[in-house]
Regions:
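N-terminal pre-domain and mature-chain start segments
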Residues: 1-88, 101-131
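Helix-rich interaction surfaces within compact, conserved domain-sized segments
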Residues: 90-98
Length: 131
């Protein structure tokens, strides 16, 4: 699924007044905490409030991980989680801590020594490898 297309459509609906800011700026407090503390900054400005800079937060879910997943604080920690022998699913979410906008940007499998894990490891949705 191309999450950016869905995102852009949702932003247009907000701009047209068909969807309210409160409908889309409803990030969970834990997601906002992760955004402030471990989010990877992007160069993009929030499409909703035009004030905040967006950050990317990654959550990793899989066997032998906490039920709420793990939110790696560094790229090295993310890479270590993605090299696990057990398969994991990674979710990259863009977040604006200023207005609580959030949107899933990418979901990909990793771990389990899959070809997809090697292909996806450390790449951002549109900017290539994460550094």
């Amino acid at each position: 699924m191309e999450y950016r297309i869905v995102r852009n459509g949702l932003v247009r609906e907000v701009e047209r007044g068909r969807v309210t800011h409160t409908d889309v700026c409803d990030a969970h407090p834990e997601l906002l905490r992760a955004a402030r503390n471990v989010g990877r900054p992007t160069k993009e400005v929030c499409p909703i409030c035009d004030d905040g800079r967006l950050v990317t937060v990654t959550f990793v879910f899989g066997a032998k991980l906490p039920p709420g997943g793990r939110c790696p604080g560094t790229v090295a920690e993310l890479k270590a989680l993605c090299r696990r022998p057990e398969p994991v699913l990674c979710y990259e979410v863009e977040v604006c801590a200023a207005c609580a906008w959030h949107h899933l940007m990418r979901k990909y499998p990793a771990g389990g020594e899959t070809k997809a894990a090697a292909k996806n490891l450390g790449k951002s949705p549109s900017k290539g490898p994460v550094r």
